[in-house]
Amino acid sequence: MNKKISAAFIAAILIIPTTANAALKTEVNVSKPTVVVIDTGLDTSIPMFSGRIAQEVCILDWNTCPNGKNFMEGPGASVIPSKFINKNGFDHGTQMTSILLGNNSDINVVFIRIVGNTATGSRQIITELPIVNALNWAFNNKDKYNVQAVTMSQGNHNLFPGKDYCPKTVSTQNQIKRLISVGIPTFLPAGNGRDYKRIDWPACIDDSVSIGAATDYDEIPIWANVDVLKTDFYALGQWDATIPGNEIKSAVGSSVSVQIAAAKWLEIKKNKPSLSYSDIYDLMSKTSTVIANPTGLTGKLMNVTAALNG
């Protein structure tokens, strides 16, 4: 699937001078559950990431990982050159990681960079392959890092018309299914394009946990994509995110919702450790709050308090 993946979020971003992305040399508590975050790149010098980044990985279509190849694993693998990291959406991965960790203090992150940069700082085209390989990496390393969820706050809206609009990307779907088989959900964003019949790929894949954005008034915003059959849950779609340089900016959209949903899912899992993937999903569905968009289309808002008491 040779389609460009665009960041599925709306955010107010100020271009600011960056600091060097020096990795924080701190020990990680590997007994904690880990979320694999698949995104653009990471400023590992952010203080809130200290002791929370279990591993960095780079998986690209191009030979533009920091080691000059299309795969790299280890310190520095997720790094974007500092002169580019606050441009062209490369700060998105830092934002998403900060939102995830800001909503659950008891998890670690493995960050997989899937977006390459050119010598001039442009984003390189992404095919399906790095996504498939990133999901495969998450599965193969699930025991080593205690992986309990995967998030990817990226998507595109290059869809087909009609009800059967979701691209048939069997390789991606099979990787998501394989993760489900070992109890690991893959959270993906519905998108923000004001489409009331279709959500973004790959969230439209039925085996994913597709997440739409909700306002702090418990409503589906007018700009949110909605598919009442394919959107699994809604979660808050706004948060003060950290961007490279350790500045705070407001982020809005279903990208935000994905990270919050994953953080809350793992909160449920921690408090109810005997529950399986299906058990948690059913509990979240049963205890959710019904919300609607301005046209009356409805969805299920995650209600963590109700789920914990359920």
Predicted regions mapped to residue ranges:
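Structural recognition of the beta-strand scaffold that forms the well-ordered cores
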Residues: 34-38, 108-113, 146-153, 185-189, ...
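Extracellular S/T/G-rich loop segment that most often corresponds to the catalytic His/Ser-adjacent loop
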Residues: 33, 39, 59, 200-270, ...
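Active-site core segment of subtilase-fold serine proteases
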Residues: 23-108, 116-118, 130-133, 140-146, ...
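Sec/Tat signal peptide C-region and signal peptidase I cleavage site
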Residues: 18-22
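Bacterial N-terminal signal peptides
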Residues: 9-17
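Sec-dependent signal peptide recognition
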Residues: 2-9
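C-terminal subdomain of the subtilisin-like protease fold in secreted/lumenal serine endopeptidases
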Residues: 23, 145-154, 207-210, 222, ...
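Substrate-binding/access-modulating region of protease and related hydrolase catalytic domains
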Residues: 115-205, 217, 246-259, 295-296
